[in-house]
Amino acid sequence: MADDIELNFAVPASGLVRQVAPKKGGRWTDRVRAKREARDAFKSMKANHLTVQNPSMPTVSASELVPKPAVIKPAPTSASVSRHPQPKSQVVAPPRFTNATAGPSRPAPSPQAASSNVPKSASIPAPATIKHRTSLPTNAFERPPLPPQAGPSRPHPAEKLKTPQFISSLFTSAPLPGVKSSVAPEISTGAPSNAPVDTTTFQGLGLNKLLINHLKGKMGVEKPTGIQRNCLPYMLSSPLNPDKKAGDEGPKEEPLRDVLIQAQTGSGKTLSYLLPIVQTLLPLSRLSYIDRSIGTLAIILAPTRELAQQISKVLEQLLHMSFAASKEGSDDEDEDDRPFTRWLVSGLLTGGSTRTHEKAKLRKGVPILVSTPGRLLDHLQNTMSFQCAKTMFLVLDEADRLMDLGFEETIQGIIKALEGRRRNEINIEKEMDKEGGGTMRWPFWDRGRLNVLCSATVDAKVERLAGAALRDPVLFRSEKDEAEAKKKAEGKDDAVIKALNEAQAIVIPQESEEKFTPPSQLSQKYVVLPTKLRLVALVALLRSLISSVAKGISVSNGTKVIVFLSSTDAVDFHWKLLGGVQMGQQGQQADGEKEEDEEEEGESVEERESDGESKAKKSKRKAKSKSTDDIVSLASPLFPNTTLHRLHGSLPLRTRLASLKAFATSSSQPSVLFATSVASRGLDLPLVRAVVQYDLPTEGGANEYVHRVGRTARAGKGGEAWAFVSPSEEGWVKWIEGKMGAAEGKSGVNLGQVGVEDVLRKGFGGKSYEYEARATDVQLSFENWVLASEQNAALARKAFASFVRAYSTHPLEEKQFFHTKLLHLGHLAKSFALREAPAQLASALSAGKSKRPKSKAASSATHPGKRKRDEDEDEMEERGGKELTARNETERRMYEAVRKQGRTIKSGGKLGEFSGKGQNKGQKAAATGGEFHIVNTGELERLVARRK
């Protein structure tokens, strides 16, 4: 038969028998049920067979006895399939049901053969061995060929019946799990983490509500500046967890990268690092076991004492915030209810103060410390009670000034000392843990120390310091945000500018391409004037600036003026000159001097000192010099209702601080400050309307110029900057304009020229050329003041010489504008109110140097037998004794009386050594009653009687 022929057999209904699938495995109940079904099927098949042989018996259909099999999709038929007739007397066995892909199975043998093979005494076999077949003729059909995909005739184990399915109830008698606590907590939603950040407010930047309310209510700061919008989100992104314990398992906290802040002067750099410090340490105030004894956690370094004191004042204002506002203004019910403790205090360490007092502060603990580099390194090396191992912040403010003053090695020593103390403290904690504890472990060692470097300019020196002190720093600049805001306002997006900004945000500009950017609202002007008109032009300019303030014009921009000079001698001279001159009273001053001379002539020779100066005049001069050093401010008839102040590095610390405080105090009355470059860095002096650069900067070039003019036009307010330029220095204007500007596409900075005649006319007033006569009168008054006293003349000569020395220190790049050969020394002497020729000034200065006392080395060489104590007493005698160091007039008079009493029994001016030639020490003691015995007490008795 051909291979493509497939046979189909018709099975009569009477011969239909269900084939029971073999049962393997399973439960014992299933096996019993299978045996029972097999026995019933065998009985039914036997009954059907008997019915076929005896037709008279009633016919019972097999379908009524055996359950119907599952519906199987019939195999496809072909037209060429041959059908074979079935004999009526025979029963055709049903085909075996296999999978859909299998072909027809072999015909089963007859029931008789199947039954004959089973012994009568044997039990019914298992379902797996039972096979129901019906007898068919061997020649009834031929087996068709199997298709290629046909499987085996026996059922595969994978073809077992499907797993029985069960439908169960959702709820049973078992109780459902409940909440452990009796009261279910309310689930609160946190702040949105993917919401846009509002950088225009402190709240949007993530600042604490306590600090926001304090800034707005007490300090008048409502919105952040550009540099604060840039750096605050990053520096506030890693708050402290006060509940963290040492040794807690969890993800290790990665420390923040160090920060480099570059922004203009007056842009808010101080608050940019003070706010993150205070907010980071504030959560520790909720812990009752944290107090000042924890040590120093933040250190701020400033280059000068004045800047350090200013930072300390701002920090104290921040730390005086009210903690009561936290619960009143808080809407978060889950906020920590633990109260705050006031353990955050600030401390100030500067040179010139008493180290003993500073050690007492450090022993108690100063969490936030403001210091100058030298004094901090001194305490790190010598003060064992200084606990700074846990320092979390180190701020270097005005880094460019720190490098200019030569603090690079000092800063490196500070960093090494901090690292050493940190390692020692960690090792001590480890040793204590091995021994069984005993100390509180610090849980924030893994945070490390965040180093912050602030500077208005970034040059090669600052880059070197950043490389040594910072670790993978992040640079923040305010100009980038301003450029982006301007670009958004114009609706432009330049890919070139964007790429330039991104490059500048990463790469620090080199010194040769650096641009120094002053505030854009600053009005910069310069005056080209002859050298001999400098002094009267300064007076005229100050009068015009002060008069506008007195009339109520531009009061909002400030009522104060700063005048920068090149030397400390020039500051002292101009301050005393403008404060001491008396217009129209020169004759009275001359008469007073004549009377003093007549009194001096009437004195006897015995009352004169060895140098020819009378004792009364000398003591009067000493008292006058003492009182002059204590004076903080002066008044001048040239500037009505105006106070004059001075500031330079050679002043005593107490005088410097008092002068700076008096000038910085807000007042409706105008004031003028004469200062050196010590006032050009970091000082936030409020209400400064104008800056006058009477002497152009000698060191620093454009950098120093920008820092000087940055004392005004701060925090968005207006201001003026004036520069005095001689005709030979006029090329400096174009040079400084080229040095200033912005590297991000802004237009350059231009200095506007103002005529000297306009300045004089506006300052002195009058019609036509009347200002010339008034300026001449002022110049003559200055010259008469210099001639009135030798001390004033010496002060003017020293200021003149200091100006020439400072003028010669301009860098090589500026020598084309500033050279001593270009100076007219005669006109320059006129600007210092001197009538002497420059040659005579040089001889007078050399004569003054020759009159100076011998140094200690020379004295020791001359008198090798002198003790150090004797030399110190000689030096004290030459300086005027203890009278100059007296705290009040009574103490000074007491010192003077004791010294006068000692002269009667002294030898060589030393009290306690008695004269007497040819006598040994024992004879002297016997004759005088003992060493240090006062022979006559009349002077002391007269002094006490006069006081009564």
UniProtKB/Swiss-Prot annotation:
**GO BP annotation list:** ribosome biogenesis; rRNA processing
The catalysed reaction is: ATP + H2O = ADP + phosphate + H(+)
UniProt motif (Q motif) ranges: 200-229
Q: List the Pfam families hit by this protein, alphabetically.
A: CTE_SPB4, DEAD, Helicase_C
> Domain Helicase ATP-binding, which positions?
250-476
Biased region (Acidic residues) positions are 593-604
Residue spans of biased composition, Basic and acidic residues class: 605-616, 878-899
Give the Helicase C-terminal domain ranges: 597-757
Keyword tRNA processing assigned: no
**Name of the protein in question:** ATP-dependent RNA helicase DBP7
Q: Residue ranges for motif DEAD box?
A: 397-400
- Show the segment(s) annotated as Disordered: 43-160, 583-626, 844-929
Residue ranges annotated as compositionally biased, kind Polar residues, are: 50-62, 77-89
**Gene Ontology CC: one annotated term:** nucleolus
Looking up PROSITE patterns in the UniProt record yields: DEAD_ATP_HELICASE (PS00039), HELICASE_ATP_BIND_1 (PS51192), HELICASE_CTER (PS51194), Q_MOTIF (PS51195)
Task: Specify where it is mainly localized.
Answer: nucleus
Q: Which SMART domains did the record assign?
A: DEXDc, DUF4217, HELICc
Q: What is known of its domains?
A: The Q motif is unique to and characteristic of the DEAD box family of RNA helicases and controls ATP binding and hydrolysis.
Record flagged with keyword Calcium: no
Provide the protein's localization. Answer: Nucleus, Nucleolus
Q: Where on this chain does ATP bind? A: A263, Q264, T265, G266, S267, G268, K269, T270
Q: Which Gene3D superfamilies match?
A: P-loop containing nucleotide triphosphate hydrolases
Tell me the protein family, please: Belongs to the DEAD box helicase family. DDX31/DBP7 subfamily.
- Give a short account of what the protein does: ATP-binding RNA helicase involved in the biogenesis of 60S ribosomal subunits and is required for the normal formation of 25S and 5.8S rRNAs.
One annotated GO molecular function: ATP hydrolysis activity
E.C. number:
3.6.4.13
